[in-house]
From Swiss-Prot:
This is Arginine-containing cyclodipeptide synthase eshA. The lineage of its organism: Eukaryota, Fungi, Dikarya, Ascomycota, Pezizomycotina. Belongs to the arginine-containing cyclodipeptide synthase family. It comes from Penicillium shearii. GO terms for molecular function: ligase activity. The gene is eshA. The conserved DDXXE motif is essential for catalytic activity.
């Protein structure tokens, strides 16, 4: 295990020249950070100075508390701090707080960057002794509803939650490629070849490399806890890979008669193909990460990605095939009548003023839906014995509430997606108030960025300013292009880059 010391910095000059520089992450422990938009803190030293620098450390302490609660959740009840070393000697996986915090400016206000909880990412060590593997993550954790003492299993070894799911996702292409492909300068229509010929972007590969290891850490801890308790509980990992969410762009072009329905359908095919290729690569990266951590039994977990042929996608395609305009009302009605009833239950929780008025807004709301979908699925409840029914009749409402099934969703994502999960938390709060629905809780975990734009001066996101199809050079080496895999190699290691290259080629993507 090595502490990351580099951040990739995409420099976009006034003359539109592009270069990538690898910056060493500065270590600061004073109150003045010279305007730096990213740096590292030694948390032990900083927390000792808490009284002298209370404003500086108020949110650092809150961030640390979030990490402590994640520690309590994932570690077994008996693995309290004093016995972590004993647990490791026994071969049990253990999560420990590290000694540093990464501070990356994520906010859009004038406050100093060290005075906002959104900016602090705590170092966390995941140790898997049986696999002789240790991983270091910089995570930021948000909670709502769960009690501080909640763990995956009780001291008696009973699962606290009837279901545990991990959710994540990755954006396809980048904003520039998607925009260029729908504004072809030659025809004014769409440029399908631009999408088809696009190599994997900086944003796609950086995120998969960054998030897959964090997902594997959290997932492996869950799986190993289930094995220790012999609970038979199977972890579910769901990756939300967009597809039809992007279709509104070309649908608008078709409505304005700037392209034919054939071109639109070909553009949709290119997006769907990318959905499959990037999704397959992401799945393989997580599987490999689990194997590194000693998880070789694939029956202990299920991993999959969202479908690109759901109701909304089919209706949009069908309308375009018949040279018609996709109808939002028709799509909503079809979603509402789906057999499993999940969307119907979800949509009932959305205030009328927050409901979508176009396909773009529907696509965004669908991200929220997928994030909490595990809470919406209905499971057949076991029929209680007659004696149990008698006991249940005598229980108080408070006691009944405690006996409700509980489900846990852990998100592992980029902090750029925070709005999705914040909105998901609001819906889950409503669901928990319904007596007939399981109590579902969402633990938000955000992985720290390692690829910044212009020193993070404007907090710009790589997904929006990813330079492809243009290729930057390495700063100071004007004839050395820095391809996406080159950046992965520099930030995450040669093995990570080689594995990604192999999985991408197996998925049919040229790199």
């Amino acid at each position: 295990m090595s502490i990351p010391t580099d951040i990739a910095n995409l420099l976009i000059g006034e003359d539109a020249k592009l270069s990538i520089h690898f910056d060493k992450i500065p270590l600061h422990n004073d109150a003045h950070h010279s305007g730096s938009k990213f740096y590292m803190l030694s948390t032990n030293r900083a927390l000792r100075d808490h009284e002298e620098k209370e404003d500086d450390l108020k949110y650092l302490s809150k961030g640390r508390q979030g990490a402590i609660r994640l520690n309590q959740l994932l570690n077994a009840p008996h693995l309290i701090k004093e016995r972590e070393s004993t647990a490791q000697n026994e071969g049990k996986a253990v999560m420990r707080l590290g000694e540093t915090a990464m501070v990356i400016d994520e906010t859009f206000d004038a406050q100093p960057i060290h005075s906002h909880i959104w900016n602090s990412f705590m170092s966390i060590e995941f140790r898997f002794p049986q696999a002789d593997f240790t991983s270091l993550q910089y995570l930021q954790t948000s909670w709502k509803g769960l009690e501080s003492g909640d763990t995956l299993y009780t001291k008696e070894g009973t699962p606290t939650f009837e279901e545990v799911s991990i959710v994540s996702g990755v954006c396809l292409f980048n904003a520039r490629l998607l925009e260029m492909s729908t504004t072809c300068p030659k025809s004014g229509g769409v440029d399908v070849d631009l999408l088809k010929s696009s190599t994997p972007t900086y944003n796609e590969l950086d995120y998969i490399a960054r998030a897959s290891s964090a997902i594997a850490d959290v997932a492996a801890m869950n799986i190993l806890r289930a094995c220790e308790q012999d609970s038979g509980q199977r972890l579910t990992i769901k990756l939300d890979i967009p597809s039809w969410h992007y279709f509104h762009t070309v649908a608008t072009k078709f409505v304005s008669k700037q392209c034919s329905n054939t071109e639109v359908l070909q553009w949709m095919d290119a997006v769907d193909q990318r959905h499959d290729q990037i999704g397959q690569t992401f799945v393989e990266a997580i599987r490999y990460g689990l194997e590194q951590r000693g998880i070789h039994d694939s029956t202990s977990y299920g991993i999959g990605m969202t479908s690109r042929t759901n109701t909304a996608a089919i209706l949009i395609r069908t309308a375009i095939e018949h040279e018609e305009v996709p109808s939002l009302d028709a799509i909503l009605a079809a979603l509402d009548s789906e057999e499993d009833g999940c969307w119907k239950r979800f949509y009932e929780m959305i205030p009328v003023k927050e409901r979508p008025s176009n396909l773009d807004q529907l696509g965004y709301l669908y991200y929220v839906y997928e994030a909490i979908r595990p809470s919406l699925a209905e499971r057949p409840a076991p029929v209680p014995l007659e004696s149990d029914q008698t006991k249940k009749a005598n229980l108080s409402k408070k006691a009944l509430k405690k006996r409700k099934p509980r489900r846990l969703i852990i998100s592992v994502d980029d902090s750029a997606e925070r709005r999705i999960y914040s909105r998901a938390q609001r819906v889950l709060s409503k669901i928990r108030q319904c007596s007939e629905k399981p109590e579902t809780y969402l633990v938000e975990s955000y992985v720290c960025r390692r690829f910044l734009v212009n020193g993070n001066e404007d907090r710009a996101r790589l997904g929006r300013l990813d330079p492809l199809p243009d290729i930057p050079v390495r700063t100071g080496f004007h004839h050395e292009p820095m391809l996406p895999l080159d950046v992965v190699r520099q930030l995450y290691g040669n093995k990570s880059a080689l594995n990604l290259q192999r999985w991408l080629q197996e998925a049919g993507l040229s790199v």
